[in-house]
């Protein structure tokens, strides 16, 4: 590896500009000759007050080959960046693979749907309960599962709970893994009440569109908040942590999601990952339609 770069906070400089700026003879024509460049997202084709189009910089540096993970859905680029590179005589390989799509899920969802990528986290007993009938829920899952949740939190821009969960559990909603404490996401409350200090509030799920700076959102409950997001088709991925216990008469993981026919529930989710976390099972599902 000769150099690497990643897009900086605020959107500029872009990853390509930083990577090219670190190679020998950077800024000169053909400075990347003989090299292969790998990018998760298609180099942009539009100029900006904060920097030139990345596809122009790459075309000028002229690596032999550019491997692109995903097309940029931004209409100012969408295929035009790749076209510019090919016109410059650069071989371009477009992967459109699952790994790069996953790494860009927040950006792609913002660009195409105008909202964050939403992951719903559920921690349940074998019979789908998230608490005892009296509300006791600490702890259903074990230490390894809870540590895994904190690792997922560290990957998110924001974390959301409903007002009922906030009042009942007073959750910290932070990351408590050594070395990752500074990666705690912004906290968001779904409520019609006043937001506590340091917490953003939305009154209904659709208002996630207006959460500035949030491309990925982790939804941690409770049952009514989770159901409201599912009912409005705002969940892209489900993380299910299941403990080997049976509660019986407890509190269900979900409220009413407005499902009218069983057939409508099928074919909507696909298994993405499964693993064992101590005595608990973790499975993730991604939306297929």
Language-model features: locations:
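Zn2+-dependent cytidine deaminase-like catalytic core
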Residues: 2-99, 228-230
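Short, conserved clusters of charged catalytic residues that mark active-site
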Residues: 14, 95, 102-103, 144-147, ...
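Short, well-ordered, mixed-charge alpha-helical segments that flank or form enzyme active sites
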Residues: 46-48, 74-78, 100-104, 126-132, ...
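Proteins enriched for Cys/Gly/acidic motifs involved in redox and nucleic-acid/cofactor modification
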Residues: 82, 96-125
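Enzymes that bind and transform nitrogen-containing heteroaromatic metabolites
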Residues: 27, 83, 116-289
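Residues that form generic nucleotide/phosphate-binding pockets
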Residues: 22, 103-110, 152, 210
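Hydrophobic "anchor" residues
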Residues: 1-2, 46, 130, 137
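Short acidic/polar alpha-helix capping motifs at helix-coil junctions
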Residues: 45-49, 111-114, 194-197
